[in-house]
A protein has these predicted regions:
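Conserved, structured core segments of small domains
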Residues: 1-101
Length: 101
């Protein structure tokens, strides 16, 4: 598996007057993302402060697999988050947890 840097951006349904946790279906989105983390697919993730974007570091075999993994996210279907970019990433400094099997 390879590492990918994934940028997700706010979609048309994002409500700027609400916090992250106040967006529609927050609990379902959080559960979904936590499951990806527990499975070792999402290694790191969080909002990029001062931007409408989120950075994820994900393990996958291809960019298409990244898209497939994120498709069931409730926030994808609600157009709260969209994938803006999927780029192969090489870790040069530091270490990440070993992938789950």
């Amino acid at each position: 598996m390879r590492l990918f840097a994934v940028i997700r951006s706010r979609g048309a349904s994002w409500q700027n007057d609400r916090t992250l946790e106040e967006q529609k279906e927050w609990d379902a989105h959080a559960i979904f993302m936590n499951r990806l983390q527990d499975a070792g697919v999402v290694v790191l993730g969080g909002p990029l402060e001062g931007t409408p974007e989120v950075l994820l570091v994900m393990r996958a075999n291809s960019p298409a697999e990244v898209v497939q993994c994120l498709q069931p996210d409730p926030w994808t279907g609600l157009d709260l988050l969209r994938i803006a970019r999927v780029t192969p990433w090489t870790l040069r400094l530091g270490t990440l947890p070993v992938a789950a099997n």
